[in-house]
Amino acid sequence: MKRTIAIVAGGDSSELVVSLRSAQGLYSFIDKERYNLYIVEMEGHRWEVVLPDGSKTPIDRNDFSFMENGEKKQFDFAYITIHGTPGENGILQGYFDLLGIPYSSCNVLVSAMTFNKFTCNQYLKGFGIRVAESLILRKGFEITDEEVINKIGLPCFIKPNAGGSSFGVTKVKTKEDIQPAIEKAFEESDEVMIEAFMKGTEITCGCYKTSDKEVVFPITEVVSANEFFDYGAKYNGESQEITPARLPEDTAERVRLLTSAIYDILGCSGLIRIDYIITEGEKVNLLEINTTPGMTATSFIPQQVRAAGLDIKDVMTDIIENKF
């Protein structure tokens, strides 16, 4: 009997549109001969299932069920592809845990920690992993331009501490731009991370593990036409993405080993993607960890799956079946 899979998309952040694109990607990737697939759209209090005829019907949040043709349908598995709250920060994971519904991503604790960039990076720094110098600023508190310059220096990045797709991120080069950048970041998050700029090559590496296999994908090098890998570079084609990355083999191997190690240190589950920057002397520096990475046809993970010579349908089946 076919399992019924919910591809859960949407969310309550600026990343909603990106998430809906990822849902379409996943719908095309997952094996429809093996699974019954439905896209579930969440936006605030609107939780709806998209039915095969394109109409939408509400989800019963008491048990995450829905009605189709007068029959109550229950989901066997949730593939979470919400980028941002509530799907990337542990909230939705906790809901599914309460209902006993298995899901694709990391658990509550890991999701919450990795969504908090500052906390995650400081935690991993304790394991000897290189990260940029940074500080955290919470809503209601202020920091002077001089403090930023003295503690972090210029240029620097000012970004929402919780968020993705580069919404609210500014590369700050001058003293005059510090406060406007902080205000912009606070529009996306209650906490702002101020991070030292690192000059180097941006790369990203995907990974997943099951009970009987470990897969670390070929690394992608990101060459942005913009100041940094911002929203335009990510989604409007304003970057060159090279897979496999043009790295010395020993550096690439260190990145692959580090990606696998971080997966285990944090206790990740499902597909993750880790962003790094390679600085002078082939030093590998962690930027951030994505536990619900983009899954559009042109996203990094599908690119890396193709470069590895794998079938993305098989990868999706691995992720789902590992939870049963």
Curated annotation (Swiss-Prot):
Free-text comment on the cofactor: Binds 2 magnesium or manganese ions per subunit.
Protein location: Cytoplasm
Protein name from the UniProt record: D-alanine--D-alanine ligase
Pathway linked to the protein: Cell wall biogenesis; peptidoglycan biosynthesis
Binding-site residues, Mg(2+) 2: 288, 290
Pfam families tied to this protein: Dala_Dala_lig_C, Dala_Dala_lig_N
Gene3D superfamilies the UniProt entry points to: 3.40.50.20, ATP-grasp fold, A domain (3.30.1490.20), ATP-grasp fold, B domain (3.30.470.20)
Family membership noted in the UniProt record: Belongs to the D-alanine--D-alanine ligase family.
Cofactor(s) required, per the database record: Mg(2+); Mn(2+)
Catalytic activity: 2 D-alanine + ATP = D-alanyl-D-alanine + ADP + phosphate + H(+)
Described purpose of this protein according to its UniProt entry: Cell wall formation.
Keywords tagged on the record: ATP-binding, Cell shape, Cell wall biogenesis/degradation, Cytoplasm, Ligase, Magnesium, Manganese, Metal-binding, Nucleotide-binding, Peptidoglycan synthesis
Keyword Membrane: no
Top-level division of the source organism's lineage: Bacteria
Residues engaged in binding Mg(2+) 1: 275, 288
Positions annotated to bind ATP: 149-204
This enzyme's EC code(s): 6.3.2.4
InterPro entries xref list: ATP-grasp (IPR011761), ATP_grasp_subdomain_1 (IPR013815), D-Ala_lig_Van_CS (IPR000291), D_ala_D_ala (IPR005905), Dala_Dala_lig_C (IPR011095), Dala_Dala_lig_N (IPR011127), PreATP-grasp_dom_sf (IPR016185)
CC terms in the record's Gene Ontology section: cytoplasm
Residue ranges of every copy of the ATP-grasp domain listed in the record: 121-321
GO molecular function ontology, one term from the record: ATP binding
Biological process according to GO: cell wall organization; peptidoglycan biosynthetic process; regulation of cell shape
